[in-house]
């Protein structure tokens, strides 16, 4: 019966609510509302998660979110923004019975780099084995204001771990709904969901992300460019059962 509430906190670079490095985080019955994270002009990297940010290196980090709500959280960067509410890299991510509404990942109006990008309006996951069940993603958005920037995954951004993590990863989404999410910009991909399997040309190695959707509904999602509902690329597989567009 533990309850956790973050309301209108502010921070820089990583997660105004919870920031964790090389460890595991469990959130149960949490409420994260109107948290904001931004960086400064000329910053090196970008913004990674506004409510929760978990960074791993050896695959041991685990993020578990259950029966929680993330509303109106916002990340803004002059370089790149990943995860308007939640970010994790390398490890495992489990999200069950949770709601993500009106979260935003965007670049600054006048970004430092002309290729500044925004990924995952609600959630951004790099190099993670992922399970999402019984969850709702509504009215989340990503937007890149850079001339050559990308806007990827209005609600959810999934990517394999070319910079670490296992070579073969799975992402399972079950009994969930994506409604009214959007990506905006000159290169906008995946109004609700973006998933990519990477290739390391120097090592000639593929990093595979296999995506499995079961009883998932996509409706009213939009993209300025490609994939109004979802955009999937790379060597990984895509399996769909009882998916509604």
Question: Model-predicted segments: where are they?
Answer:
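Surface-exposed loop/turn motifs in large extracellular/passenger domains
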Residues: 1-41, 46-78, 86-110, 115-146, ...
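The feature encodes a structural signal of leucine-rich repeats
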Residues: 83, 190, 227-228
């Amino acid at each position: 019966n533990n309850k956790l509430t973050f309301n209108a906190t502010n921070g820089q670079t990583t997660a105004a609510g919870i920031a964790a490095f090389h460890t595991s985080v469990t959130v149960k019955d949490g409420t994260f509302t109107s948290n904001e994270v931004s960086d400064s002009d000329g910053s090196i990297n970008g913004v990674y998660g506004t409510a929760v940010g978990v960074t791993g290196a050896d695959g041991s980090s685990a993020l578990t979110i259950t029966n929680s709500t993330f509303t109106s959280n916002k990340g803004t960067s002059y370089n790149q923004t990943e995860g308007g509410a939640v970010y994790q890299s390398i490890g495992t991510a489990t999200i069950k019975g949770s709601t993500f509404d009106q979260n935003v990942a965007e670049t600054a109006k006048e970004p430092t780099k002309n290729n500044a990008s925004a990924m995952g309006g609600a959630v951004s996951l790099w190099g993670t084995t992922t399970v999402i069940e019984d969850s709702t993603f509504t009215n989340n958005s990503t937007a890149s204001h850079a001339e050559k920037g990308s806007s990827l995954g209005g609600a959810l951004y999934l990517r394999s771990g070319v910079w670490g993590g296992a070579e073969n990863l799975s992402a399972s989404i079950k009994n969930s709904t994506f409604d009214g999410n959007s990506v905006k910009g000159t290169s906008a991909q995946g109004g609700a969901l973006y998933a990519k399997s990477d290739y390391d040309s120097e090592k000639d190695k593929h990093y595979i992300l296999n995506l499995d959707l079961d009883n998932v509904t996509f409706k009213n999602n939009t993209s300025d460019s490609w994939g109004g509902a979802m955009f999937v690329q790379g060597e990984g597989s895509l399996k769909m059962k009882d998916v509604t567009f």
